[in-house]
Amino acid sequence: MGYLFEETLSSNPKTPIVVDDDNELGLMAVRLANAAAFPMVLKASLELGVFDTLYAEASRTDSFLSPSEIASKLPTTPRNPGAPVLLDRMLRLLASYSMVKCEKVSVGKGERVYRAEPICRFFLKNNIQDIGSLASQVIVNFDSVFLNTWAQLKDVVLEGGDAFGRAHGGMKLFDYMGTDERFSKLFNQTGFTIAVVKKALEVYQGFKGVNVLVDVGGGVGNTLGVVTSKYPNIKGINFDLTCALAQAPSYPGVEHVAGDMFVDVPTGDAMILKRILHDWTDEDCVKILKNCWKSLPENGKVVVIELVTPDEAENGDINANIAFDMDMLMFTQCSGGKERSRAEFEALAAASCFTHCKFVCQAYHCWIIEFCK
């Protein structure tokens, strides 16, 4: 049975807290020192299917579920009789981060019950074709392949080198994926860029009049699938390495073409570079962009979809948090990879012979940037 509440019930008595600067700083310090708990609980909850279970129930009945009810509805039924107690402990942490809503039943055992909050829709495993999902992004970020690279961070600062290579026998990320089918599949399932593209298409008009659109490093082709569904006149060419295309489904109007963007790029009226440039050094980016430039007609353009770092690290700025978090992910995952500022993108455009660089619009954490020939 689900639980419906007309009013919010207070789950905690009001406890007087001495408010002073030292106390507040101490609380912040303790929270930071224990920050590892939240992402690991988030990952386990995603793997268990907790958010999908809660969101499905909230969509149907808008009701709360007890930990026992959640356990019984998970995709894999727990064999552990203590699972509801453990789920309750995990869920109350998630509730403290406003990912789920917690209430306490005033009858019976007085147990806590939970309901999905709206933010959960961004973490649904089965929501990739709707808005995209961050679930796979969380899971891949905390996979052992990437976790092992973080252990190298101190030594890279002191001695130099490449964090990913130090952790994986000198191999770079994309070479490694050719040797690890499990991780490659997991990496290519990261699907939130679909949400970015869909959000951008609400306002971005730059694909109107395009006949042939090449997605350079397009992975499994889902970006072109979204674009061509809105612009069915466009012929899409999804261009990537053979290993990436091996898992690509078919999309109407989209052709999958294998190749290496460092060698050449298929011709098209326009091109997409979606979260590609942040994987590479400036020198490598210029090589990729020059190959794009060669394959474009006069007045052609590359539509770059990337995060743009702020010039200053503003305290409490969510965009700065995201930008610098992701920059450190690039630091540890990709040799020479980094997030870039507006000035750095303008410099890349100039070094690659493009006449100008236009920052058109923002979708979630990414900007749509046009490099115009």
Swiss-Prot record:
Q: Which GO molecular function annotations are given, in alphabetical order?
A: methyltransferase activity; O-methyltransferase activity; protein dimerization activity
Give the pathway. Secondary metabolite biosynthesis
Species of origin: Arabidopsis thaliana (Mouse-ear cress)
Say which domain of life the source belongs to.
Eukaryota
Is Transferase found in the keyword set?
Answer: yes
Pfam families cross-referenced by the UniProt entry? Dimerisation, Methyltransf_2
Q: Which Cys-Cys disulphide bridges does the record give? A: none
Gene3D superfamilies assigned to the protein according to its UniProt record, in alphabetical order? Vaccinia Virus protein VP39, Winged helix-like DNA-binding domain superfamily/Winged helix DNA-binding domain
| Induction field | By the green peach aphid Myzus persicae.
Record protein name field: Indole glucosinolate O-methyltransferase 2
Q: What is an annotated GO biological process for this record, any one?
A: methylation
- EC annotation? 2.1.1.-
Provide the family line: Belongs to the class I-like SAM-binding methyltransferase superfamily. Cation-independent O-methyltransferase family.
Q: What does this protein do?
A: Involved in indole glucosinolate biosynthesis. Catalyzes methoxylation reactions of the glucosinolate indole ring. Converts the hydroxy intermediates 4-hydroxy-indol-3-yl-methylglucosinolate (4OH-I3M) and 1-hydroxy-indol-3-yl-methylglucosinolate (1OH-I3M) to 4-methoxy-indol-3-yl-methylglucosinolate (4MO-I3M) and 1-methoxy-indol-3-yl-methylglucosinolate (1MO-I3M), respectively.
Its encoding gene is what?
IGMT2
The residues that the entry says bind S-adenosyl-L-homocysteine are 217, 240, 260-261, 274
Enzyme class label: transferase
Q: Which PROSITE patterns match?
A: SAM_OMT_II (PS51683)
Query: Any idea which UniProt keywords this protein has?
Result: Methyltransferase, S-adenosyl-L-methionine, Transferase
Q: Which residues form the active site?
A: 278
